[in-house]
């Protein structure tokens, strides 16, 4: 049986980049589902997809307007949006071998046959950095945080809370998980709603919920980047003694977290793209406005199989839009 793959895109801006990502993933074995942040108008995202794939039938299945969520960075709202996407794919009746969460400003790095081959395996593309049982990251769960409540944000991290009696782990939000792993997560959350209640006022629960459930499951040995037992003070620090001191690989993504004080990864540029292409990542984030995709020579004329940038040859630094 030919495997199928579900892609979930969380989008909140840059409809043209979102549409280019959708177009780059257009394949008979891939179904794309999208959640557009309720804070923005979803119509430009629909229109952008129709513009790049005018002949395609349902190239994207969007979360319905009534089900969209206003997403706030660091809040449980991103977990809720991910669960809406999972519910939408479950409702389709289709069975998927793998489920992947992407951002609307992600860049596909590999040719589709290579992507399909990687997705057909059984590894859980997930990065788990640390257990939240001690150290500075414990403050993410032992104090109240209010990213989804603007009027209370000034109190975030100031109010202690009762201990959460669960073994908790933290890692990168972006994941690509087998259907077995997604099934474990879905059943766990259905059987124990306390998971989401306990982490509702954590900081960045999107980096905790799925990771913690899988680390306590039979799928834990299949997690591709499990660094929870490493001894380190700061999981982003490039001088860590841990083998995970490469802070650019996060599950299936290249994300440059080499700045230990950074609060957001920098936009992708040509040099970062070269590093991403030379590594194992399948996707990179995040691409800036004006970047379009995803095939053709590198800017200096260096052509290589699988190169996914599109740039003109007129001397302009602006990427050129290439349609396939």
Language model segments and positions:
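ER/Golgi luminal nucleotide-sugar-dependent glycosyltransferases, focusing on the catalytic module
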Residues: 1-306, 315-324
């Amino acid at each position: 049986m030919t495997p199928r793959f579900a892609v979930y895109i969380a989008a909140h801006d840059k409809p043209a980049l979102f549409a280019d990502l959708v177009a780059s993933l257009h394949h008979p074995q891939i179904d794309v589902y999208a959640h557009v942040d309720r804070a923005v108008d979803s119509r430009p995202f629909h229109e952008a997809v129709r513009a790049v794939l005018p002949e395609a039938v349902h190239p994207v299945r969007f979360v319905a307007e009534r089900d969209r969520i206003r997403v706030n960075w660091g809040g449980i709202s991103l977990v809720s949006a991910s669960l809406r996407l999972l519910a939408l794919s479950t409702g389709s009746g289709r069975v998927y071998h793998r489920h992947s969460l992407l951002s609307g400003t992600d860049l596909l790095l590999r040719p589709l046959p290579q992507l399909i081959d990687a997705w057909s395996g059984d590894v859980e593309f997930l990065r788990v950095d640390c257990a939240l049982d001690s150290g500075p990251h414990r403050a993410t769960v032992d104090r109240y945080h209010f990213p989804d409540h603007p009027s209370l944000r000034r109190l975030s991290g100031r109010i202690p809370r009762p201990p959460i009696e669960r073994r908790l782990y933290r890692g990168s939000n972006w994941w690509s998980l087998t259907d077995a792993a997604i099934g474990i997560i879905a059943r766990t959350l259905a059987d124990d709603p306390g998971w989401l209640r306990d982490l509702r006022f954590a900081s960045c629960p999107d980096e905790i919920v799925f990771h913690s459930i899988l680390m306590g499951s039979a799928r834990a040995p299949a997690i591709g980047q499990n660094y929870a037992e490493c001894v380190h003070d700061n999981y982003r620090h490039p001088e860590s003694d841990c083998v995970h001191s490469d802070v650019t690989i996060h599950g299936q993504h290249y994300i440059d977290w080499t700045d230990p004080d950074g609060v957001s990864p920098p936009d992708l540029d040509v040099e970062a793209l070269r590093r991403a292409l030379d590594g194992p990542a399948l996707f990179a984030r995040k691409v800036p406005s004006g970047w379009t995709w995803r095939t053709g020579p590198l800017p200096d004329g260096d052509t290589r199989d699988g190169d996914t940038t599109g740039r003109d040859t007129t001397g302009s630094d602006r990427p050129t839009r290439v349609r396939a």
